[in-house]
Amino acid sequence: MKEHRTRKRFGQHFLHDRNLVDRMIRTLGLQTGDTLVEIGPGRGALTYPLLEELPHLHVVELDRDLIALLRQENTPERLTIHESDALRFDFRTLKPADKPLRVIGNLPYNISTPLIFHLLAQADAISDMTFMLQKEVVERLTASPGTRDWGRLSIMVQYHCQADYLFFVPPEAFSPPPRVDSAVVRLIPHDSPPHPADDEDHLRKLVAQAFTQRRKAIRNGLKSWVSAEQFQAVGIDAGLRPDQLSVADYVALANISRPPADVEDANAPHTEQGKGDNSQ
């Protein structure tokens, strides 16, 4: 592929280590009939090796210069290019009738977290996602309760899927080299949550509220949300810190509680703020 100048606003760091590319592809265990979509193909470091293994590949790319280069070097029969912002793309449209979609990508670090939640909202169409991300984010995605990396991101992602740390990727595997280490993670959406929440929006807000006082007992952060009697009813020690509770614990607390009246009012449709809390 011809030379392309990286664009800082797209968070572009292009992978160029073929050994790591091959290792990432091997972890997929590609099978005949798989429908795979690559997010952010860039210069094709993953794209071309994937096309050696597959008869056809979908890619989602926003950079028009890269799209032009990909179109010059590939036919639509082999490579379908979707010119779109991945954060707005409807991945369900790519799912075949008989099998779920598979997703892969070296994701721009500046959009990785919102993009993962965008994909999880469409998880009914996806069997698995394999991503190269900032190592710190991968450690948070795959963390366990009681560890320093366990937090809002860990809980909400693991509510929706199984998260597995696959392998480390050094900065020199990219051009230009990022200032951080990277790693590869696999996310496998649950067919249904092992611990279903009655209201996922309430669960998300409760988890966010709990971690406003990460180093204190959870009773402090959830003082207006969960009563002492409710903690006792679900068998959770209110003296534990927020990072010591599991996904199941948070679901139990969410299912037995309601947000304080002022939080409900702030998110009611008739208020001026009516958009609610969309933070993750």
Curated annotation (Swiss-Prot):
The keyword RNA-binding applies. It is found in: Cytoplasm. Disulfide bonds: none annotated. S-adenosyl-L-methionine binds at H13, L15, G40, E61, D85, N106. One of its GO terms (cellular component) is cytosol. GO terms for molecular function: 16S rRNA (adenine(1518)-N(6)/adenine(1519)-N(6))-dimethyltransferase activity; RNA binding. Gene3D superfamilies: Ribosomal RNA adenine dimethylase-like, domain 2, Vaccinia Virus protein VP39. Keywords: Cytoplasm, Methyltransferase, RNA-binding, rRNA processing, S-adenosyl-L-methionine, Transferase. Its EC number is 2.1.1.182. PROSITE patterns: RRNA_A_DIMETH, SAM_RNA_A_N6_MT. InterPro entries: KsgA/Erm, rRNA_Ade_diMease-like_C, rRNA_Ade_Mease_Trfase_CS, rRNA_Ade_methylase_Trfase_N, rRNA_adenine_dimethylase, SAM-dependent_MTases_sf. It comes from the Bacteria. Residues 258-280 are annotated as: Disordered. Specifically dimethylates two adjacent adenosines (A1518 and A1519) in the loop of a conserved hairpin near the 3'-end of 16S rRNA in the 30S particle. May play a critical role in biogenesis of 30S subunits. Belongs to the class I-like SAM-binding methyltransferase superfamily. rRNA adenine N(6)-methyltransferase family. RsmA subfamily. PANTHER family: DIMETHYLADENOSINE TRANSFERASE (PTHR11727), DIMETHYLADENOSINE TRANSFERASE-RELATED (PTHR11727:SF7). This is Ribosomal RNA small subunit methyltransferase A. The gene is rsmA.
